[in-house]
């Protein structure tokens, strides 16, 4: 648990999001009294070890979350990312965090596709078109950046779908990021 909470064993080395989630969950559980003495001791040790790993090493020096890393990639590739059409595949917390970060950076041409049409509830100021997977192939033709954050056994976007979209787009490049 200490390895995960400290960011040593996470998707992005040094990621701080997991540590924050761990602390929040632990404190909520402790506040409502569902954590026993042993788990309190264990959780406090995890927090102590995680803080020590961050302060005594460079692990958290330039750490980003998975969504932050995706946004950094978008900014590195596109000169004007706010002019690009973005398609977010998925509607879970990671997808919602990606959408929130995109909006914070002025990128607001965002559409969201999910297995079932699910309203993404972030903030009333975010206007996001939501659609089902059936509309995915049509949306690809108008999309410059695809950020997928859906857990699935099989690929949601296949080679043929990308080739068809590129043909329709007259080979205008697309960035596909799978989180």
Residue ranges and their predicted role:
Residues 1-5, 95, 131, 164-165:
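Short intrinsically disordered, low-complexity coil segments enriched in acidic
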Residues 124-179:
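Rossmann-like adenosine-cofactor binding region
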Residues 117-122:
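Short, charged/polar "capping" segments at the starts of alpha-helices
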Residues 15, 91, 115-116, 149-151, ...:
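Fold-independent oxyanion-binding glycine-rich loops
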Residues 46, 62-67, 71-103, 107-115:
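Glycine-rich adenosine-cofactor-binding loop
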Residues 1-77, 81-82:
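Glycine/serine-rich phosphate-binding loop and adjoining beta1-alpha1 elements at the start
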